[in-house]
Amino acid sequence: MKVALIGYTGSVGKEIFDLLDKKNKIYTFNRANILTILNEEYDTVICSAPTSQKLKVNLDLIDYEDDLNNLCEMIKQVKTKNFILVSSQSILFEKNKYSDLQNKVLKTVSEFQPNNTIYLMDTLYGENLKKGFIYDVLNKEWTIIKKEVLYKYPELNNCYKPIENSDFYQQIKSLPDDLLNKLGYIENIYPNDKIFQTTYIYYLALNVVSNLDKSSGLISKIKETESFKGSEIKNIYYNSNNTILSKYFSNSKQKFKKRSHEKNIL
């Protein structure tokens, strides 16, 4: 099978690339060479949305519009039997520049690639994703804070930038240990009563790769997706059970202990 993969260096795209059967003929693309995809025909085109650029786009730190226009033009013209888009549910509910641009991608796929599968996932987690609820719980990090936290600790202004049209700020560089210790645990950032649909990126990528020749339309969860209240996720970190998320927490904590032990030996 001839497969084109756009966004192969991102947290989801990298996992998809690693899982693609070597029997497939794989072509990889990024924003620098995106339009060269039009030189060939494919069995399947996979596009993994670059969520790592979200904050920079909303703060106008990068000009994403030209890249997006090229992406949409490619979607309109590329010759493929199936088109797979991997994106986030947040683009449907958040009102910011990044969501507006990604919605344009979603609409272009729906209009010009009728044989499509569109994954709009909620809360993703995995080894290569260094942000979000699960990452913060596991690493005691604060990748997102509320405005009032900045009032209390003004020294944080160097580490955070505002998220457009919200009362939240997103981390742009790692916090020094002394600041991290001041902040303590992230209990107040992620609502206890909110429902989070969590999906391990490996299983999402496996689902994509296992269904390369199928057109399934809009997908908001897969078989391995688990739903929890925010309070349940925080509890699972301390009290293990048989869920996929709990196993991920346990494995990650074991890896952390091993790295710490090796570091102490050195």
Question: Locations of the language-model features?
Answer:
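N-terminal Rossmann NAD(P)H-binding glycine-rich loop of SDR-like oxidoreductase domains
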Residues: 3-23
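Short-chain dehydrogenase/reductase
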Residues: 10, 61-65, 95-106, 131, ...
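NAD(P)H-binding glycine-rich loop region in Rossmannoid oxidoreductase-like domains
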Residues: 34-77, 89-93
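Conserved Rossmann-fold NAD(P)-dependent oxidoreductase catalytic core, especially the SDR/UDP-sugar
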Residues: 72-101, 116-119
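C-terminal substrate-binding subdomain of Rossmann-fold SDR/epimerase-dehydratase oxidoreductases
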Residues: 154-266
